[in-house]
A protein has these predicted regions:
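Active-site bordering "gate/hinge" segments
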Residues: 1-203
């Protein structure tokens, strides 16, 4: 589970949203790197640290998730919540050993700390190896999103809850109390591994 904290931007740039599958002029992975504040050189450096104890395989996983909720009770909105999860994790495999570590930030110091922690957990004693990175295309989204949740305001969500509230009361005059809620979550993920692949995904 990645930590919750303030991050540079609440919304993912449109260039990242549209780049999935190579549809944008700027690649999805390159756009995601900009968003997470990392470069290809940074990723290679962190990957090298993850493999410095002789790991057979390593991957880096960056995640930026937005969670929102609205609760309506007694015909009124009585609770609204929002949470942002942001951070990165490093996994290293060495034989039957698995090392994993995560941090709630993406400074070079934090990423290297996670990489070296994972490397120590899964250590084979062999020499480390260098890694190149090549963008891989994930199958184009099967369920196109016409409007990202992060672009939908709380004000725009309330009418749906009010309509649901009214509908439930209209179904049976024995209904005395209704609580309705609407929650949404959007995740942006940057993933790269020691086999040379790098990917961006939106969930």
């Amino acid at each position: 589970m990645l930590g919750s904290l303030a991050v540079p931007s609440l919304a993912m740039p449109a260039s990242v949203r549209g780049a999935l599958g190579g549809a944008d002029n700027q690649s999805a992975v390159a756009s995601a790197m900009v968003h997470f504040g990392v470069t290809e050189a940074d990723l290679k450096k962190v990957m090298a640290a993850a493999l410095e104890k002789g790991g057979d395989y390593a991957d880096l996983y960056f995640e930026h998730t937005f969670n929102n909720s609205v609760v309506l009770m007694d015909g009124k909105v009585n609770n609204c919540g929002a949470n942002i999860d942001f951070g990165m994790g490093v996994r290293v495999l060495a034989g039957d050993q698995t090392g994993y570590a995560y941090v709630e930030g993406v400074t070079m110091e934090e990423m290297l700390r996670a990489a070296r922690t994972a490397a120590r957990i899964a250590s084979s004693g062999k020499a480390g190896k260098s890694v190149g990175l090549t963008e891989k295309t994930i199958t184009k989204s099967r369920y196109a999103v016409t409007e990202p949740w992060e672009d939908v305001s709380v004000k725009a969500k309330i009418p749906y809850l009010e309509k649901l509230n009214e509908k439930i009361f209209s179904l049976d005059n024995r209904v005395r109390k209704v609580q309705a809620s609407l929650s949404d979550s959007t995740s942006h993920v940057l993933f790269c591994n020691s086999e040379g692949g790098s990917y961006y995904d939106s969930r």
